[in-house]
Amino acid sequence: MLMACYSAGQLGCLVFCNEAEYSYGKCIGRGRCCCYDL
């Protein structure tokens, strides 16, 4: 499984991760997202 964490800014995590072509995303607080590719 690939994982990358980003500062997503105003985008929601799911939108941000989907646009980055990951399978799904999870917020980890303070506007940061971890995106996962299953």
Curated annotation (Swiss-Prot):
| Disulphides | 5-27, 13-33, 17-34
Q: Could you list the residue ranges that cross the membrane?
A: none
Keyword Disulfide bond on entry: yes
Which controlled-vocabulary keywords does the entry list? Antimicrobial, Disulfide bond, Fungicide, Plant defense
Provide one Gene Ontology biological process annotation: defense response to fungus
Q: Hey, which family's this protein in?
A: Belongs to the DEFL family.
Q: What is this protein called?
A: Putative defensin-like protein 105
Instruction: Name its species.
Output: Arabidopsis thaliana
